[in-house]
Every structure is written in structure tokens, then in C-alpha cells.
């Protein structure tokens, strides 16, 4: 009797805990939905201020106590909050104009792309915001990191960058780590490409792979029916039997995509020997420079620092609002999603 009572009490506690978790989760979801009325936030920060702060932090540590005291006193006197307006003028908190900005602006944006290129959602907002305020002599630096992915995803990302070129906004793309396949499709849109010596560049090709378990299913007496309206609605399948005709058609589709890729790169960088470079091979940055795939060997950091005196440098980042639940599991979901695209989806750049 005692045992039954203890078991019942234990089960009752479990039920209470489950109901509590459901209750708390529902409250969190309601709060997150209310917060998500605005679909995202555009943050703009000054990299001039960032590098100045870093420099001053080191300078202060090198001072003796007396000099440090004078520095801090002078720093407090010089502090005055300023804001940047759309017509490129600096104003104080009372909306009084202090000084007209004479320098052009270098807008810095980042793109770290996955296989599905979902990051293009933020990229398009960042580019739209820059286009809306950019003036003559303003430039854009895109810090790119991507090993490529779906054709439609990276095709859209490359076209988004073309919006800057079509408006005569000078675009520099820096590759600190990797820009291959669809990543290089984006990079080639730039007016000027810089890369680090050991970054990985190239892979102008198309690949597609996924398993076929038809023999396994047949061995276990499992039938799969696939019905299509249209001869080439589905070429290769995972579960069904793939015929030589299906494979031939699939390879044709790969070649069509490859030809489009080659033409796009050649249009953006006419000096390339595209037939020689479009075999899917990758090169280190220093070798890619000799093959004219990039224009200079440099890091994005040095590129920015070299322009601090000539440009007002702003880092622009658009972030979509997400529910708390989605934010907690986003990385895991992204990994699973990339695996699905890699092994079960169609052709990839």
C-alpha cells in the first residue's frame, strides 16, 4: 500500500512539473510574440570610435599616475554626445548642428553564409538601408565567409550585391577565411576583392549528392510509388529506382547550372580565363591572386584601419526578431537544416 501511495505521489509531481513547464512556455511565447511586432532591428555603430577606444585604452595603461589623472580630466571635459542624421550632419542632444561631415562613409556589413543562404534575409535589409542614404564617394565593405550552398540562395545573394554596383556604389569584398562556390559567386560581384594568403578561394562548379535506398527497400519488401505529371518533374529520387535516362537528365541540369555560373563570373570579372578556372578547383588566397580571382592580399582589419582617417566607418547589421524558443534552439535547427540541404536537396554551388 505504501509503495502504491509513493508511486502515485511521484506521478502526481511529474504531472505538476509538466503542466508548470507548459504554462511557463506559453507565457514566454506570448511575450515574445508581443515583442516581435517590429520584424527586426537595424543597428549602426561607429568603427572609428571602436578603434579609437581600443587605442586610447592601451595609451592610458602606458601613462604614469599623474599623466593618467590629467588625461581622465581632459577626457571628461571633451565628452559630448553626437548623432548622425540622414543629411550627413552631426547634431547634439538639443538638435543643434555642430559640424558638417566632410568625409565620405564606408559602410561595413558581414555575410557568414550557410548552405541555404538564409542570411540573405538580413543582407537585403542592410543593402536597402545603405542605398537609401549613400551619397557620392561612399563605399561598402562586405566581410564574406561562405563555402557555398543552394543555387537559388546564393544566386539571390549575388544579385543583392549587384544592387550596389548598379548604383555606382564602390563595393569591396574581403575574404579572411573562405569564399568558394556560391561564396565566390558573391565575391566576384565586387569592384575589388581582397583575401588573406591562406584563405580558400574558387570552386567554380556545381555538385549534387544524396543517398538512394531503393535496393534496401526492395530487399525488405517495401514498395515506394512516385507519380509525376511531366516526364522530367523528378529526375533522381531517394526512395525510387533511378534509371540511366534519369541520371543523364540530372547531369544535363548540372551542366546548365554550371554554364550559368561561369557566364556570371566572366561577366563580373572579364579578365579571367574562365574555362581554365571553372573546373571546381580551390586555391589559397596567394595563388588565387596570381590567377586574378582576387585583387589584393590583405585582411579586412587592415583594410578598415587604412581608411579610418579618410572615411567615417559605420558597421551596419540587421537582425530579425525571434521568439525566445527559436533563439535557444536556432543553432541546432540550423545544423539540422544544413544537413538536410546537403544530403537531400538538389544541386549546390
UniProtKB/Swiss-Prot annotation:
- Any idea which UniProt keywords this protein has? Cell membrane, Hydrolase, Membrane, Protease, Serine protease, Transmembrane, Transmembrane helix
Pfam families, alphabetized? Peptidase_S49, Peptidase_S49_N
Give the CDD domains listed for this entry: S49_Sppa_N_C
Question: Which terms does the record give in the GO molecular function aspect?
Answer: serine-type endopeptidase activity
Q: Name one GO biological process term.
A: proteolysis
Q: Where is the active site?
A: 181, 233
Q: By its UniProt entry, which InterPro entries does this protein fall under?
A: ClpP/crotonase-like_dom_sf (IPR029045), Peptidase_S49 (IPR002142), Peptidase_S49_N_proteobac (IPR013703), S49_SppA_C (IPR047272)
Query: What sections of the protein cross the membrane?
Result: 10-29, 188-210
Entry's Gene Ontology cellular component terms: plasma membrane
Q: Where in the cell is it found?
A: Cell membrane
Enzyme Commission no: 3.4.21.-
Q: Which domain of life is it from?
A: Bacteria
Chief subcellular site? membrane
Function text: Possible protease.
Q: Which NCBIfam families match?
A: PRK11778.1
Supply the name of the protein. Putative protease SohB
